[in-house]
A protein has these predicted regions:
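Accessory alpha/beta interaction modules
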Residues: 1-169
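N-terminal low-complexity segments that are often proline-rich with Ser/Thr-Pro
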Residues: 171-173
Length: 175
């Protein structure tokens, strides 16, 4: 990790600064996320799966910052998981890297939900039993923000759909 990345990690670890960043990026500057409603989460994402050869495969990734945000917005209360990735250099596949973090976080939510259902033996259908997830279960949204710290103008993709996809125009809207 570069010195710039380390300093940015320390800077945005502060809940007031983190809330400001999120409010500006996600809500156009409106004060929706409050510093006192942020809670630090483990930045390590670990996902295990059974490979084709029946051996366990484990993948571990470390986020720069990951927080739990309790939000009151449009009269309702929400919980959102927000990660920040500090980037000193242009990273031409950053949307895929961030998507990988997000998929791991969603996968862990599904795994924890399935574990709870197995313990409580409360899956109603064979489909729910197989997936470990019921029709009523909900995932907590995961958002990852990239903070670019470089001096060159960012010319990399900002979304997965602009990450060198080789899709025909008619398929582009489906990706």
């Amino acid at each position: 990790m570069s010195a710039k990345d380390s300093m940015a990690k320390e800077y945005f670890a502060d809940n007031a600064r983190f809330a400001d960043l999120c409010n500006n990026i996600l809500y156009g500057g409106r004060e929706v996320i409050l510093p006192e409603n942020l809670k630090e989460r483990d930045t390590t994402e670990v996902l295990t799966a059974l490979g084709l050869d029946k051996k366990t495969i484990a993948v571990q990734k470390l986020r720069d910052i990951f927080k739990n945000a309790s939000i009151k917005y449009t009269g309702k209360s929400y919980v959102v998981l927000i990660g920040v990735e500090n980037q000193s250099d242009i990273h031409y596949s950053i949307p895929v890297k961030n998507m990988f973090y997000d998929v791991m976080a969603y996968g862990n939510q599904v795994k924890e939900t399935a574990k709870k259902h197995r313990k409580e033996k409360d899956t109603a259908t064979s489909d729910e039993f197989l997936s470990g997830f019921s029709k009523e279960d909900k995932l907590i949204p995961v958002i990852t923000i990239t903070v670019y710290l470089g001096t060159k103008e960012w010319d990399g993709p900002r979304t997965v759909s602009y990450t060198h996809l080789r899709a025909h125009e008619t398929e582009a809207d489906l990706v």
